[in-house]
Structure formats: C-alpha cells, structure tokens
C-alpha cells in the first residue's frame, strides 16, 4: 500500500479534483495497466503550453506503466465543445479538423512517448451511431440535468441561445469513454461536467465508472484569462526558443508561480525554496529565467535554452528592462502608433511614427521597422526609447 501512496501522491500533484479518489486507489490496487484517456478536439492547428498541463500528467501515467489513449475528436470537433463558452461555438469542417489533427499528432510526441501512446479517432464509433443510436444516447440525460451545468445555466438565465447539438456534445464525449472502456479520463476544470457524464454512461453500460481527474487551466500571458490561441495570450510548443524566452519573461511575477506549479517538473520543495528566496530579496527575474530555460529545453534543447537566455540578456537586460511595468489591455486590432499613445509610451501618434523611424521602438526586444503595423490578438512588452516600457495585451 505504501507504493500506491507514493504513486497516488505523484499523480495528484497539480490536480484540482479526483472523482473519486477511492475509485482511483481501487483501480491502482488491481496492479494492471489502466486505460488513461485524454480527448482533444483539433479546433486549432497548434498545441500551446496550456494544453501541456494535461499532457504532462498523461506522460506521468505512462512513466508508471499505464496505457495512454490520446483521442482526437475528429467527430466531436465538427460539433464544437460548449464548455466555458458564453455563445455557440461554430462547428469546423471535416477538412479543417483532419488538417489540425495531423499537426496534433506531431506535436504531442514532444511530451508523450510515441511507443506507449495509442491514438484513436472518435469518428470510428460515433460516425456509426446513426439516428437510432443518437436517440438512444440522448435518452440518457434530461434537459434539466444539462441545465445544471454552469455555462448552460448562465446562458439560459441570460436568455442566450443554446443549440440542441451543444446538449449532445457531453453525451458524445461520454460515449467515447464507453467505447474505450476508459479507467481514467483527464481534462481541464472546465471539462468536469463532461467527464462526469462519462462516468454515468459507463455505469449505464455495465462498466466500472472512470475516474475523472481535472487539472487547473493555465492562465495566459495576459494574466487574466486561460491560455487560448484566439485570445493571443499563448505560447505554442513549436514557437522559436527566443520567442518562448521573451514571452515567458514578460509574465508577471505572481503568474510565474502558477506556471511553476502547472508546468515545472522541479520538486515541490525546490519551488518552495525559490519562493522563500524571492521573499527574502532574490530578484524574481532570476527564478523566471530558470522556468524559461526548463520549458525551452523540454521542447527544443538545453543548448537552445542557453542561447535564448544569452540573447535575452543582450536584448533586454542591457537595456535595463524593469521588473515591474504598466499593463494595458485593448479590445480588437489596433494600430501600433495608437497602441503606443494609449499605453502612455508616446504623447501622440506622430511621435510614435517618429520614434519608429529613429529605431526607438521595440516589441519584445526586436526593433520595429514599420510604423503602420497593426497589432492583433497577442501579449507583448513594448519599449520606446531606453526607459519606457509597457506590457500590452490585445484581445
């Protein structure tokens, strides 16, 4: 039992909820490879650091000898997951889904062991349900139970439309667990309802219910909302090392600790020691550099991490980038000159244009050559001259 306690403690690290822990202990006691499921709808072509929180947990299960099933929702991706959404998500075409799925398959192996990963597509069984099967599946849940879900409840109360296919989505995801006979399903905290539907459907099918394991959502570069490509507050796992380094160094000191908790493989005791050192006067930038290097080494190499650090020092620290700077958020695309003016970095758009012409404007340490640049969804550090800095998020 002591071995199980050690394994359980490791598996619970960074986890928000385990439903239920008693079920997980019982499954671990069976001393067999458990089927660990993670589903992902390929709604965008790139995987970002937010996705890696659950992928890292999958890899941990692999290291303990369990069978990892990475489910690509090529069928459900055409439906659109409503989790956490305040409006109906537009479904993707099959062509978009399949194109994005190919990219997913390449990128997940930056974390998962390809020899120990089984990739499946849920169209293999959901595509065969037919009308009769879909009606039978829908009969497992009532509209009242669906409206217990927070996002549906909010939209219903605010008289926002909820499409019928959005009610179907949790049932399709739950049916995936039945088809795979999953022992454990991982997901973000916004997936809790869907994971619990899987437990219910497995019980109805005469299977032992899966353990639902939820992990916190990684907050993006803006320090406010979950990391998302659509919000521009993300770091892709295929981003260049220098870009990764600059973006990680741009996050706030408070957010850095959340990222350590969710992204770092360092022992918890070492992270606690870092916190104590910063509390006692150590520059948090030094600790942030260690986080940046750890993440870059994982997706590129240690040599790339060292080079990116040196490049950052050459670009930023010699320019004395401050530890703290003003932060701004703008909605919708905005011209660079207007952004600099609204962020208080220049007095007018004409001054912004003049500073660009004089090589006095930088974005993440890179000189800007075109004053007519339009800034879309993103988070960057903007510098004007030697001493004016601002962290700006465009959504």
Swiss-Prot record:
Belongs to the class-I aminoacyl-tRNA synthetase family. TyrS type 2 subfamily. Its main location: cytoplasm. InterPro entries: aa-tRNA-synth_I_CS (IPR001412), aa-tRNA-synth_Ic (IPR002305), Rossmann-like_a/b/a_fold (IPR014729), S4_RNA-bd (IPR002942), S4_RNA-bd_sf (IPR036986), Tyr-tRNA-ligase (IPR002307), Tyr-tRNA-ligase_bac-type (IPR024088), Tyr-tRNA-ligase_bac_2 (IPR024108). The lineage of its organism: Bacteria, Pseudomonadati, Pseudomonadota, Gammaproteobacteria, Pasteurellales. It catalyses: tRNA(Tyr) + L-tyrosine + ATP = L-tyrosyl-tRNA(Tyr) + AMP + diphosphate + H(+). GO terms for cellular component: cytosol. Homodimer. Catalyzes the attachment of tyrosine to tRNA(Tyr) in a two-step reaction: tyrosine is first activated by ATP to form Tyr-AMP and then transferred to the acceptor end of tRNA(Tyr). It is found in: Cytoplasm. Its EC number is 6.1.1.1. GO terms for biological process: tyrosyl-tRNA aminoacylation. Keywords: Aminoacyl-tRNA synthetase, ATP-binding, Cytoplasm, Ligase, Nucleotide-binding, Protein biosynthesis, RNA-binding. Residues 334-394 form the S4 RNA-binding domain. A motif ('HIGH' region) lies at residues 42-51. It comes from Mannheimia succiniciproducens (strain KCTC 0769BP / MBEL55E). ATP binds at residue 229. GO terms for molecular function: ATP binding; RNA binding; tyrosine-tRNA ligase activity. PROSITE patterns: AA_TRNA_LIGASE_I, S4. A motif ('KMSKS' region) lies at residues 226-230. This is Tyrosine--tRNA ligase.
